[in-house]
């Protein structure tokens, strides 16, 4: 590189030679006009000029900024309840500024001035403190002199008064007075010495405790400081936080904490200790150092509260009433074997056990005070009069219950029932020789257990129909159990006596094994032989019912507000919720306000079992009522009340309580079945949307379908209800991939449109047998297939040949079945499988063939296996899929 002289450099940078020489001189470089300039000299000059214009020179950058980025993913729950991932980027910046030498010098001067000012302030404060102390000492001495002079003056006056009194006293009185004075002075001196000694001991004890506590705190603080420093060394500090700032914050925190503890430590000393410490030579020496603090907390006894527990309560609310943390309640319940969460609803029994376990007194609260008040505020002052018996007809399927009742009512109802089977409860009343009897007909199918149980609870007498040619069947035994559980007398009607070869004694023997003993055998059960087809024995059966009712002496008040029970309920298109009610007491009138389970309403219309409008109904009369707010559950009690507003409040309270109890039961079931739910990914589900004509059918079908569930396939009722199939039901089925089942109901136009567009599976049924069978078939189709291996051929190895292309070729004789080229094989030696694979070649007379039958010779090449020996057996098999059924 060519050298540059001063003149050329001045021309390049656009300045004069004299000015450039002057700048070189200021930078400490001596140059002449014609001398050359090196690169180092140029750098020195540039550095000098940069400093002159406020720069930092070439020592390094004046300011340096460090940036740090960290990215992470945060899971956030949106408004729809679904979790989504959000990218979070954290940026941290720290800036370093380089101080010049001049700034450093100014900083040093400033620090020196501050230090000098601080020393002057300290000296001034010390001087003021000394002056204040001298002033206080002078005031103290003056006060002591004044007190001493006052005491001497008082003593002088007391001596003068005493001498004056002594002059007036007798010698005996004077001696006694002097003795009392000496005794008083001695007692006062002893009291002062005892108080002083006690104060000294207390001061020593406090000093010793303070010293021990100070040592403990010092060791603890030292340990905490070491741990903090260790954490700081291992942790990654924020780049903008300096070490000095962190240390200053730690010192400030420690000072604040110390001040807080000192403030808590200060307590007012007892009056006698103050007095003892303000006397004598130990004056002012009993004050303990205020900078020390103790860490001892006085132990407190557990607070035992009275906890009021309602029927359902959340864990958080229970913890609040016990004045403990929710985590403590959760921990206690875990120890008791219940896995709960803080917001979970638990029942009254569980809450009572937890509260008693934690040592609290439990008060059980009944929240149905309004309900009891409304139900008690009823007029039931009517005189009881004889009423008609309520008779329930029970029996097994197709044993003739409905036919027997039809003959009594002289109306054919059984032919109208689908499949000749009673699908839901029917209630009728008939007149027999001037006496009225109300009959309840119950289904005999196994699915309708709950309906039969409700029928037994609402009845006075049970007629058990048993077919003479069929004998005692499962539902017959169940009916006996229901009647016994309800405490209802039985009348046995042995039906189908018109058939040839029937044996009624067989029925008696079988029922006798169930402890249903006939009257002629010494029991209390009436047996009547009947035929629903010819009418044989029907009059005797009705006579037996009337005789039994006379023995029971059935009475009920006919005047007053009515009460009854819901036999059945349904949703009628055009009329709304319809409930069949059996009146048990009082008179039910049109316009009455009825509280019916979870529903309420004013009766808009009443109809009897024949569909005729009526205005009132007395005891033992079944009626249909319209006007309820919803569909009540079969078996609910129906009660007439005065106030519609209070009836609404009670119904809403019952709905809330039912919801809470149901939620608690579901949560408990979820937790108990936690481990079984872990494997639900392998379980197939058949989703069903079920609609039926009456509530009882919904219960029966849901129960039957749920019982079909197995470990591999489960039936899930995703939706159910009373009434026709609506567009909402079809949409639900489409969303949950369910089949739509209608039992005695049909889909409306909008629902059919959705079903066609979504290509849903819609099925109508009128007999419960068909419904259960078809759902069972659908479940069978979802079972995992089962595979079975079948041996189709067996070949004996007679000789082994070697092939350059394939390897070992087994010359075989087919001894059983067929050897197929495409089938898998096993090689057996001494009846032990030594290889499993497939055929590579199958030839007969050098021709490739597809199969070789029994009794023929062939050559077999086993793929990837050359250890075939004479005497081995080659077994050919195929895998067959077997269709599984439930």
Curated annotation (Swiss-Prot):
Region (G3): 441-444
Gene: infB
Region (G5): 531-533
Renumbered residue ranges of the record's region G4: 495-498
Family: Belongs to the TRAFAC class translation factor GTPase superfamily. Classic translation factor GTPase family. IF-2 subfamily.
Name this polypeptide is given: Translation initiation factor IF-2
Gene Ontology molecular functions: GTP binding; GTPase activity; guanosine tetraphosphate binding; translation initiation factor activity
One Gene Ontology cellular component: cytosol
InterPro entries cross-referenced by the UniProt entry: DNA-bd_dom_put_sf, EF-G-like_DII, EFTu-like_2, IF2_assoc_dom_bac, IF2_II, IF2_N, P-loop_NTPase, Small_GTP-bd
């Amino acid at each position: 590189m060519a050298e540059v002289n001063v003149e050329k450099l001045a021309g390049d940078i656009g300045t004069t030679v004299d000015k450039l020489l002057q700048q070189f001189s200021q930078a400490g470089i001596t140059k002449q006009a014609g001398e050359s300039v090196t690169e180092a000299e140029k750098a020195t000059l540039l550095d000098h000029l940069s400093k002159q214009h406020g720069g930092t020179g070439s020592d390094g950058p004046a300011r340096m900024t460090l940036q740090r980025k960290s990215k992470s993913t945060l899971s956030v729950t949106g408004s729809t309840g679904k979790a989504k991932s959000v990218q979070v980027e954290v940026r941290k910046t720290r800036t370093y500024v380089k101080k010049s030498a001049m700034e450093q010098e100014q900083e040093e001067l400033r620090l020196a001035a501050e230090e000098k000012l601080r020393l002057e302030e300290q000296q001034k404060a010390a001087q003021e403190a000394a002056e204040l102390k001298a002033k206080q000492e002078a005031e103290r001495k003056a006060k002591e002199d004044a007190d001493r002079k006052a005491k001497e003056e008082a003593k002088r006056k007391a001596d003068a008064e005493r001498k004056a009194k002594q002059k007036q006293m007798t010698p005996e009185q004077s001696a006694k007075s002097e003795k009392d004075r000496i005794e008083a002075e001695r007692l006062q001196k002893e009291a002062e010495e005892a108080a002083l000694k006690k104060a000294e001991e207390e001061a020593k004890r406090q000093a010793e405790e303070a010293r021990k506590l100070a040592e403990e705190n010092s060791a603890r603080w030292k340990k905490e400081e070491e741990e903090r420093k260790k954490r700081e060394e291992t942790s990654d500090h924020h780049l903008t936080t300096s070490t000095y700032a962190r240390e200053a914050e730690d010192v400030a925190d420690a000072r604040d904490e110390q001040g807080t503890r000192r403030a808590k430590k200060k307590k007012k000393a007892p009056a006698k200790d103050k007095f003892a410490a303000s006397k004598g030579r130990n004056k002012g020496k009993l004050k303990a150092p205020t900078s020390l603090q103790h860490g001892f907390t006085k132990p407190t006894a557990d607070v035992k509260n009275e906890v009021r527990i309602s029927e359902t309560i959340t864990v958080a609310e229970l913890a609040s009433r016990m004045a403990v943390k929710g985590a403590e309640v959760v921990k206690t319940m875990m120890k008791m074997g219940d896995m709960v969460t803080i917001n979970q609803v638990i029942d009254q029994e569980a809450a009572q056990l937890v509260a008693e376990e934690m040592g609290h007194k439990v008060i059980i609260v009944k929240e149905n005070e309004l309900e009891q008040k409304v139900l008690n505020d009823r007029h039931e002052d009517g005189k009881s009069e004889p009423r008609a018996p309520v008779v329930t007809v029970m029996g097994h399927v197709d044993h003739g219950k409905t036919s027997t009742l039809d003959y009594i009512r002289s109306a054919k109802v059984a032919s109208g029932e689908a499949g000749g089977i009673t699908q839901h409860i029917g209630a009728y009343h008939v007149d027999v020789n001037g006496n009225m009897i109300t009959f309840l007909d119950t289904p005999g199918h196994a699915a309708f257990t709950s309906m039969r149980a409700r029928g037994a609870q609402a009845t006075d007498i049970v007629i058990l129909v048993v077919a003479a040619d069929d004998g005692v069947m499962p539902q017959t035994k169940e009916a006996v159990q229901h009647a016994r559980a309800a405490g209802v007398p039985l009348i046995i009607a042995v039906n189908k006596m018109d058939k040839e070869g029937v044996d009624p004694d067989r029925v008696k023997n079988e029922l006798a094994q169930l402890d249903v003993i006939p009257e002629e055998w010494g029991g209390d059960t009436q047996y009547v032989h009947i035929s629903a087809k010819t009418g044989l024995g029907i009059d005797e059966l009705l006579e037996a019912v009337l005789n039994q009712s006379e023995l029971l002496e059935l009475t009920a008040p006919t005047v007053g507000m009515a009460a009854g029970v819901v036999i059945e309920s349904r949703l009628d298109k055009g009329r709304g919720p319809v409930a069949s009610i059996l009146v048990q007491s009082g008179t039910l009138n049109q316009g009455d306000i009825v509280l019916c389970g979870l529903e309420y309403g004013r009766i808009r219309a009443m109809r009897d079992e024949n569909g005729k409008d009526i205005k009132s109904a007395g005891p033992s009369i079944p009626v249909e009522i319209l006007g309820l707010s919803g569909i009540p559950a079969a078996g609910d009690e129906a009660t007439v009340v005065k106030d519609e507003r209070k009836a609404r409040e009670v119904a809403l309270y019952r709905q809330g309580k039912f919801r809470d109890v149901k939620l608690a039961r579901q949560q408990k079931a979820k937790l108990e079945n936690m481990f079984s739910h872990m494997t639900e990914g392998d379980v197939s589900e058949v989703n069903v949307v079920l609609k039926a004509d009456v509530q009882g059918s919904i219960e029966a079908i849901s129960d039957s379908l749920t019982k079909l569930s197995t470990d591999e396939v489960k039936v899930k009722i995703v939706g159910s209800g009373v009434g026709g199939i609506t567009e909402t039901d079809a949409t639900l089925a489409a969303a949950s991939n369910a089949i739509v089942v209608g039992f005695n109901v049909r889909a409306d136009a909008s629902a059919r449109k959705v079903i066609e567009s979504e290509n849903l599976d819609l099925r109508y049924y009128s007999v419960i047998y068909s419904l259960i069978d078809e759902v069972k078939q659908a479940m069978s189709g979802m079972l995992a297939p089962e595979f079975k291996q079948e041996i189709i051929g067996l070949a004996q190895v007679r000789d082994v040949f070697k092939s350059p292309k394939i390897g070992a070729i087994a010359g075989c004789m087919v001894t059983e079945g067929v050897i197929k080229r495409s089938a898998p094989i096993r090689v057996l030696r001494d009846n032990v499988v030594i290889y499993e694979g497939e055929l590579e070649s199958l030839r007969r007379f050098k021709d490739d063939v597809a199969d070789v039958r029994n009794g023929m010779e062939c050559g077999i090449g086993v793929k990837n296996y050359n250890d075939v020996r004479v005497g081995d057996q080659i077994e050919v098999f195929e895998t067959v899929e077997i269709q599984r059924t439930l």
